[in-house]
């Protein structure tokens, strides 16, 4: 396979410009940084358009050019939308990107509109089809129809492609009317297998870990309910919950509810955790009871750390948690089934070790950031060559 470090695309003077468009700077740093580094090392001039909070120094330290965009996540207010579109149009005009990589649904729709009439290749990353596809309520169904009507003409055009992380998300986009030829699949955003390395288990008590936003869609309430059932059977297990509420998401847990979990026996809500590898050093088993994922970074990081895993049997999670190989799967939203899976692994150190070793091997072979970076840069190159 091509060594990106030794075959840059062009000279410093005329490097192709790559613009990432994502709603939050922290999301770029947590999920897109490995592929952006791969693109930089392959010869791209990398720009990042995002809502700037605390990530400016880290992004600029990578040699990327940062552009502040007033994204308002969760808002469809006309004025806010127009302000975001205007800012994106200005950035597109100033940067004149050869490739624009939109991340998530809001950035994709607004970004594609902003690129109309521009000569740029568009990679539109769907990183797990969230609330509109996981909820059965009337509002979500209506939103799905609207999304399909808007996306079809925007994505189905020359130089534009939808990027998904699992086959089921590809099928969902096809069901919205997006042609298969306009869809590419790359499994996740990559995990640094040199930073996240196999860790020895800590002494008892047996500890379960959850890393993610505190959303119903992530199954955090199902996890708490299952843990209560487990403790009710006499288990001395512990549960570490790492993550914060997301007020812009209609499925978010409130901070008051999250604080209340700290008062329950065995549960510790940690809030935001910067050192995720350190958390997996404390936990024996990773748990993610999500309703749907693209490809969950928290499980990929746990796998790289050699941790056995438990996850709901849903798109995205299935790619990382292979039942009876890297962990256990259970029916979505089924707290008793989750409690049974937790109890099984709590009592089986040899099984945990076997699953953890297989998980590490899977992370190295399929999800390593170097591999994902190469695949992403190859996609950019292919689209540029066809332009």
Labelled PLM ranges:
Residues 76-80, 174, 181-182, 189-205, ...:
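Acidic anion/phosphate-binding donor-loop and adjacent secondary structure
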Residues 272, 291:
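Aromatic "clamp/platform" in nucleotide-sugar-dependent glycosyltransferases that forms part
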Residues 323-324, 328-335, 344-349:
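Conserved acidic donor-binding segment of nucleotide-sugar-dependent glycosyltransferases
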Residues 337, 344, 351-366, 372-378:
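A short, well-ordered alpha-helix in the C-terminal region of glycosyltransferases
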């Amino acid at each position: 396979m091509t060594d990106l470090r030794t075959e840059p695309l062009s000279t410093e003077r005329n490097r192709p410009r790559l613009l990432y468009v994502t709603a939050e700077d922290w999301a770029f740093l947590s999920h897109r940084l490995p592929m952006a580094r791969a693109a930089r090392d392959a010869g791209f001039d990398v720009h990042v358009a995002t809502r700037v909070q605390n990530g400016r120094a880290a992004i600029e330290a990578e040699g990327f050019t940062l552009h502040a965009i007033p994204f308002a996540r969760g808002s469809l207010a006309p004025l806010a939308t127009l302000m975001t579109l205007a800012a994106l149009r200005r950035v597109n005009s100033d940067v004149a990107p050869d490739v624009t990589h939109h991340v998530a649904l809001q950035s994709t729709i607004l970004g594609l509109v902003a690129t109309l009439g521009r000569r740029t290749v568009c990679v539109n990353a769907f990183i797990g089809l969230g609330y509109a596809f996981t909820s059965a309520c009337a509002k979500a169904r209506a939103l799905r129809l609207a999304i399909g009507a808007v996306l079809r003409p925007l994505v189905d055009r020359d130089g534009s492609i939808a990027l998904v992380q699992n086959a089921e998300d590809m099928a969902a986009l096809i069901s919205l009317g997006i042609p298969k030829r306009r869809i590419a699949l790359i499994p996740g955003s990559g995990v640094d297998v040199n930073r996240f390395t196999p860790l020895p288990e800590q002494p008892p008590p047996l500890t379960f870990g959850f890393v993610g936003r505190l959303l119903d869609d992530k199954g955090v309430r199902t996890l708490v309910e299952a843990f209560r059932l487990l403790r009710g059977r006499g288990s001395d297990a512990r549960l570490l919950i790492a993550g914060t509420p997301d007020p812009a998401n209609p499925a978010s847990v409130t901070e008051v509810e999250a604080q209340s979990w700290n008062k329950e026996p065995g549960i510790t809500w940690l809030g935001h955790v910067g050192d995720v590898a350190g958390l997996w050093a404390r936990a024996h088993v990773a748990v993610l009871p999500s309703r749907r994922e693209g490809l969950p970074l928290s499980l990929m990081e746990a796998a790289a750390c050699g941790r056995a895993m438990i996850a709901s049997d849903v798109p995205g999670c299935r790619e990382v948690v292979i039942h009876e190989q890297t962990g256990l799967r259970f029916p979505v939203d089924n707290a008793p089934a989750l409690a049974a899976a937790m109890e099984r692994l709590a009592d089986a150190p040899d099984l945990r070790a076997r699953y953890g070793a297989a998980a590490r091997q899977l992370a190295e072979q399929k999800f390593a950031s170097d591999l994902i970076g190469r695949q992403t840069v190859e996609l950019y190159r292919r689209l540029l060559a066809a332009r």
